[in-house]
Curated annotation (Swiss-Prot):
One of its GO terms (molecular function) is dioxygenase activity. GO terms for biological process: catabolic process; response to toxic substance. Binds 1 Fe(2+) ion. It comes from Sphingobium indicum (strain DSM 16413 / CCM 7287 / MTCC 6362 / UT26 / NBRC 101211 / UT26S). This is Chlorohydroquinone/hydroquinone 1,2-dioxygenase.
Length: 321
């Protein structure tokens, strides 16, 4: 199969269906030290829910964890194969003992220190909805500047994504897609894990695949406790269009049209492994809020400004930071 030009640059954002907005703030902001950079709404369905964006100071690609807290809307699903099963953050070398103690103090059940691909890490789950997380020790050179959080000292702060892990029943077809269509390069194996990287790897440029032949498939619909999609960065709309054209030419035709998401432009493709991938062009978060005010107000489409308060009352999912 023909290999395409290297158009995909790295991890952009991850989008997760969670339980409650406050549960997300308690974990992402008050425990992991991320900034709530944007509060918007998701309107598909009978009841609106928040769409929350967490990251570093300006929400750079490679730091963005976005959530749909869907519990009150009644969206349910099942975790399993064909989904992203863990989101891993970078932490400075030598800080895992601090993070382990900190997570325990915050009533988060956390693993002992483990090792994979020669790197030490901790694993834990979102206390409110069960989504998987990891914190991986890595040299801070070339990593993202962390948000100056009042909850986490800067010297131990998380510095964007290290990697994401997809759980699959088998990897043959997904391996071909990632190498030939998504320009990921195999980096080796560690047990049931296969590592891939964009370019030479580094911060937010790694994707792991965990093979579990016995894991039952997860659901694809938006449901609490599941990663909905994994978004990857492309440079601009022309590159995005060329990527779609060429990937469809390889036979991967389950692509969406371009979607304007307010803060990025997106196209989506269902991969052979079942994971929903997005190719995302960054527009940024400061066109409707100043850098100092990011995340301070709920932003809605202009045509909905007149009913925003009513939507918030209907949602009934308060946030206290």
């Amino acid at each position: 199969m023909m290999q395409l030009p290297e158009r995909v640059e790295g991890l952009h954002h991850i989008t997760v269906a969670t339980g409650s907005a406050q549960g997300d703030v308690d974990l992402l902001v008050k425990t992991l030290g991320q900034r709530l950079v944007k509060k918007t709404m998701f309107y598909d369905g009978a009841r609106p829910v928040y769409h929350l964006y967490f990251g570093n100071e300006l929400g750079e690609p490679g730091t963005l964890y976005t959530t749909f807290p869907v519990r009150q809307a009644g969206y349910t699903g099942k975790r399993g194969a064909g989904q992203i099963s863990a989101v891993s953050y970078n932490a400075p070398v030598g800080t895992l003992s601090w993070w382990q103690e900190h997570l325990i103090k915050r009533a988060v059940t956390v693993s002992e220190v483990r090792e994979r691909f020669g790197q030490k890490y901790l694993s834990f789950e979102h206390p409110d909805c069960g989504v998987g997380f990891e914190i991986i020790e890595q040299d801070t050179d070339g990593q993202f500047e962390p948000w100056d959080s009042p909850y986490v000292p800067k010297e131990v702060a998380l510095r964007g994504f290290h990697s994401w892990t997809a759980t699959l029943n088998r990897n043959e077809e997904m391996d071909s897609f990632m190498r030939n269509a998504w320009n990921l390069k195999p980096q080796g194996r560690d047990g049931n894990y296969q590592r891939y990287a964009f370019g030479n790897g580094g911060a937010a440029k790694v994707l792991d695949v965990y093979i579990d032949e016995d894991e039952r498939p997860g659901t694809w619909a938006l449901g609490e406790g599941q990663v909905h999609h994994a978004a990857f960065e492309v440079a601009d709309l022309d590159v995005q269009a060329a990527l779609k054209f060429d990937v469809e030419g390889l036979g991967y035709t389950d692509f969406s049209d371009r979607k304007h998401r307010g803060y990025f432009e997106s196209i989506y493709v269902r991969t052979p492994g079942g994971v929903l991938f997005e190719a995302s062009v960054t527009l940024g978060f400061t066109h409707d809020e100043s850098p100092e005010k990011l995340g301070s107000e709920v932003k809605v489409a202009p045509q909905l400004e007149g009913v925003k308060d009513e939507l918030l009352r209907t949602m009934n999912d308060p946030i206290v930071i």
